[in-house]
Amino acid sequence: MNTKRAYKLQEFVAHSAAVNCLKIGRKSSRVLVTGGEDHKVNLWAIGKPNAILSLYGHSSGIDSVTFDASEGLVAAGAASGTIKLWDLEEAKVVRTLTGHRSNCVSVNFHPFGEFFASGSLDTNLKIWDIRKKGCIHTYKGHTRGVNVLRFTPDGRWIVSGGEDNVVKVWDLTAGKLLHEFKSHEGKIQSLDFHPHEFLLATGSADKTVKFWDLETFELIGSGGTETTGVRCLTFNPDGKSVLCGLQESLKIFSWEPIRCHDGVDVGWSNLSDMNVHEGKLLGCSYNQNCVGVWVVDLSRTEPMSGGATQSNSHPEKTSGSGRDQAGLNDNSSKVILGKLPGSQKVDPLLKETKSLGKLSVSQNSDPLPKDTKSTGRSSVSQSSDPLVKEPKPLGRFSATHSSDTVKESRTLSSTGSVSDSPHRVTLTSAPKSASGISTVVPNAAASKRNFGKANPKANPPVVNKEDYFPVIVPRTEPIIEQASESRAELDIIGRTMPYSLQSKAADSRRLSSSRNEPDLPTSSLLERSQSQPIEPITLQDGNTYPSDEGGSWDTAERTNKESKCRVFGRFNSRSLVRSPPRNHDENSDLISYNANRDSSPTESRKGGRLHSLVLNRERRGRFSNFEGPVSSSSGGNMTAPNSRPSNMLKQRGNHVPVDQGITSASEEDIVADIMGQHDQFVSSMHSRLAKLQVVRRYWERNDIKNSISSIEKMADNAVIADVLLIVNERPEILTLDTCTSLLPLLTALLGSNMDSHLSVCLDLLLKLVRMYGSQIYSSLSAPSSVGVDIEAEQRMERYSCCFVEFEKIKACLPSLARRGNLVAKTLHELNLTFQEVSS
């Protein structure tokens, strides 16, 4: 293992002539594209000495290259001014675009549209439409060449820096200059946007870094002066510092306040690009026809190394770059697995406080170190999951708590830490972080926009499988076995599961139970699931969702295949039920427990003895007609029962005499049948919890679009209803873009047979139709505008998608109205609203 703060990863000959430009792929940080004077564009896998692709076709030297967001396209600008767009999968030219009169020295793709921008030594900045194969706008204003340009993360502005020492901000919608910054005294060489704030950093040949407020267009401050010009700069993903690449060193600045924290001598010469990946800074430089790849371990630099040690007591100081990370080589996944400590098994602390769904997320979903104690507030430890980096809870999604939840939390806090087993319980007290500042996803029409909408964290908006850290799911199942053998272990389990369930697990060997045991609420069953690690779930479309915070798609899928025959629960019901001893006291009570909380088996009392009689036909058909949310998981999960079995006896008070000759084998079958169904119920709760955890990861990053996309892949009506209930209470996130993604889910949920699901669905539909219905119907009937308007085109596409879904929903309403039930009133309101907006 390399112990240096900075080292050269590799150096290779990239072209037969001088290298002019290069770019690192931002999505994976595993690929590199270079352009040279030999008229070639070469694609490289970082760590490999040979090119993956060599693209021919340019007639002059390549002066600029860049990847698109998916790393499937490369744009290359040549000295002749020609730009070629390459499809890397097909290894061919997709577009050849001409228009610049001189060298094209900078290119940048729009973050989510099919557009890209180019800057040239002819002083012009051009916007190109990939679909229309041409330039759609030219911005003039620079007096010298345009060296660097970047789209803002929300895609509405583009910022350019030129050799005239000026930084210009252009509004793409209005097609005009918004503002220009003229404080630099040398040519602009680099710029970057803060991942969370409306802030721009610029680096110049005048050896300074300047920070600009993009709301007020004021200079916040300046860092430097350095010994050489600032060739590259990038914000750290936590947003607290900016990394500046100089001629042969790296400087780390904070912007609030502006000061230099650290400097690292690296050795690169003509630094051309930098990117932060997995706690490492990757820098690429070129010299003549060679390219060098350099790595700086940010966990060994200030302020990241200092902040990592304070993660428990000061969550706001935790830096994502201070975590254990893997080196950049072919065995990176093995290194990651090796570095994850055993104590970093994440406990799912997701509860349901009501049967149909208000999500209550514990304020601390990260694992606690062994020595962490409850301090009256949420403790945060370092997580190896790149999806969870200083999450900002979205208001009520993580704040729904009942008094019982708080009460249980205090009880857990008083008992101290539990055991060292996989059943670790994170000790938290009264919810505090839920009352923190809610991050609001802004409306598309808002004048002051937040970059968090398009880039809520430092991670790219496209989530890649490689972004997940693998965690090995434990295969051993010792806990229940120990519980049945050792009374001491039962004490440990007693602290992690409700008393009613604890007594059943402990006493099932001797088949005794308390009389008239109360029904178990859903929350009690979920509490039991909290003490058990959740195995991954595989959906029919091939996507595997990890159950742990640090789980990976690949590892979870592999583990799931190896354990297909295993139920989600940590134990098999037959292993809990043992044959009673021959001298079993007949005066002891038989278990009277039913997994369906709305009905119970018939009881009889004879001669002071309580027996439970469950007929064989009842055992065969007890759970045959449960109605629950649709689940497509391959494990055959059963969802939470919500309706009564038709073949159960209705009255508790009916007493049926029992023969004395019931054998212990039949008693064992009865209990095994009951407990077996209970395991299926618990496994369905595990499945539901795992799915909700996946949604929560995106939600914590304010990535609403990917949250909705993941729910759609799960195809589980219960999960859809849970999340839609929260969305319904957060009107500020119901933008037109969100509406486009939500409507297909709502259309699918209308097919549910559960009134509670329909109620949630119709309430949200009513709100969406009132908000956007009139806009959608009026826009589609209006004449098309003259000229090119990117925003208008995208808006019309969303309107069309919403219109199609609205028509599908209107077709479903008559059949729902015939059902009568509790949703009839909402249906009537929805019909009237549709008539109003479409008239």
Curated annotation (Swiss-Prot):
Belongs to the WD repeat KATNB1 family. SMART domains: WD40. This is Katanin p80 WD40 repeat-containing subunit B1 homolog KTN80.3. It comes from Arabidopsis thaliana. Disruption phenotype: The double mutant ktn80.3 ktn80.4 exhibits normal growth, but the quadruple mutant ktn80.1 ktn80.2 ktn80.3 ktn80.4 has a severe dwarf phenotype, with small and round dark-green rosette leaves as well as wide and short petioles, probably due to cell elongation defects, and associated with a complex cortical microtubule (MT) network with stable entanglements. Plants missing KTN80s have a disruption of KTN1 recruitment at MT crossover or branching nucleation sites, leading to an abolishment of MT severing. GO terms for biological process: microtubule severing; regulation of unidimensional cell growth. It is found in: Cytoplasm, Cytoskeleton. Keywords: Cytoplasm, Cytoskeleton, Microtubule, Repeat, WD repeat. Residues 303-340, 357-435, 501-561, 575-648 are annotated as: Disordered. Component of KTN80-KTN1 complexes composed of a hexamer of KTN1-KTN80 heterodimers that sense microtubule (MT) geometry to confer precise MT severing. Interacts directly with AAA1/KTN1 and KTN80.1, and weakly with KTN80.4. InterPro entries: G-protein_beta_WD-40_rep, Katanin_C-terminal, KTNB1, WD40/YVTN_repeat-like_dom_sf, WD40_repeat_CS, WD40_repeat_dom_sf, WD40_rpt. GO terms for molecular function: microtubule binding. Pfam families: Katanin_con80 (PF13925), WD40 (PF00400). A motif (DWD box) lies at residues 115-131. Expressed in siliques, flowers, leaves, stems and roots. The keyword Repeat applies. Gene3D superfamilies: YVTN repeat-like/Quinoprotein amine dehydrogenase (2.130.10.10). The gene is KTN80.3. Residues 307-334, 375-385, 411-435, 501-533, 589-602, 630-648 have a biased composition (Polar residues). GO terms for cellular component: Cul4-RING E3 ubiquitin ligase complex; cytoplasm; katanin complex; microtubule; microtubule cytoskeleton. WD repeats lie at residues 14-54, 57-96, 99-138, 141-182, 184-222, 225-265, 267-304. The keyword Secreted does not apply. May participate in a complex which severs microtubules in an ATP-dependent manner. Microtubule severing may promote rapid reorganization of cellular microtubule arrays. Confers precision to microtubule (MT) severing by specific targeting of KTN1 to MT cleavage sites such as crossover or branching nucleation sites. Together with other KTN80s, regulates cell elongation by modulating MT organization.
